[in-house]
Amino acid sequence: MRPAQPTKISLADHLAALAVEALIDEADLSPKPGLVDRRSNGAHPDMSLPLMHASALSLWPCLRQMAEAAQSFGEICQPLRASLGQLGREGEVAMLATTGGVNTHRGAIWALGLLVAVTALDPLANANTLAVRAGRLALLDDPAMVPQDSHGQQVRRRYGTGGAREQAQQGFPAVIGHGLPQLQRSRAAGASEQHARLDALLAIMAVLSDTCVLWRSGPSGLATVQQGALAVLAEGGSATLAGRRQLRELDQHLLHLNASPGGAADLLAACLFLDKAGSL
């Protein structure tokens, strides 16, 4: 009798699994200031860790279909952008049905959908190349998109700052220029994977004009987030005793402000995806 052959999954299945894994890894990462993690719900009374897991898992079909769409079109083009937009809206409906209407991963659908698609087009590309190509794809119009007066749009008008859309269109600078390099530096310095990922999150928080923070607590809250994240990194990161003290202080400040760096969390998931997908 021949030994059973291992089942070979498709590239689209693999990329969807990597993206969902990145979302779950981001949710599980602890202690994250102001965010849902294994300790608490952070500044989110309407969310929990099991809800974040369920939301991430609900996006697997949508992300797989995005990868398949990219393979079908075979290139970065406007029809692919339109297809991703439609699939993303369908994924958002599935997410909201799973969470009872709670917006857990809307920004992550956008970021990871783009990255899954460009990785499906060229799975051997490195992280920098994938981010640049995702930016090109994000710049294309989605003719079926209905303008929505979202929190992010209101923040953009009020404070003149870009959100998730602009980060993607620029090629994810907070991830490529800050999150991924910090992840690699912390690993090289001997930090555990958890601490390296926390440091990557902090590096993103330190530079991102996070619309989630601006919506909840305005520019002063954003300054608290950015300065607090820099303070942790200045003490050697989350792996050091001094860094952990700064991290606890930052968490308390954010809970007091009811501020949550949700945009940075979405970009950390993108960072973790690129960290793995960029080495396929």
From Swiss-Prot:
What EC number(s) would the UniProt record show?
2.4.2.52
Recorded catalytic activity of this chain's protein = 3'-dephospho-CoA + ATP = 2'-(5''-triphospho-alpha-D-ribosyl)-3'-dephospho-CoA + adenine
Q: Which InterPro entries match?
A: CitG, TriPribosyl-deP-CoA_syn
Record keywords = ATP-binding, Nucleotide-binding, Transferase
**This protein's record includes keyword S-adenosyl-L-methionine:** no
**Its Gene Ontology molecular function terms?**
ATP binding; triphosphoribosyl-dephospho-CoA synthase activity
Q: Which GO BP terms, alphabetically?
A: prosthetic group biosynthetic process
Q: Does the keyword Repeat apply?
A: no
* UniProt similarity note: Belongs to the CitG/MdcB family.
Q: What does this protein do?
A: Involved in the formation of 2-(5''-phosphoribosyl)-3'-dephosphocoenzyme-A, the prosthetic group of the acyl-carrier protein of the malonate decarboxylase.
- Supply the name of the protein: Probable 2-(5''-triphosphoribosyl)-3'-dephosphocoenzyme-A synthase
Organism of origin is Pseudomonas putida (Arthrobacter siderocapsulatus)
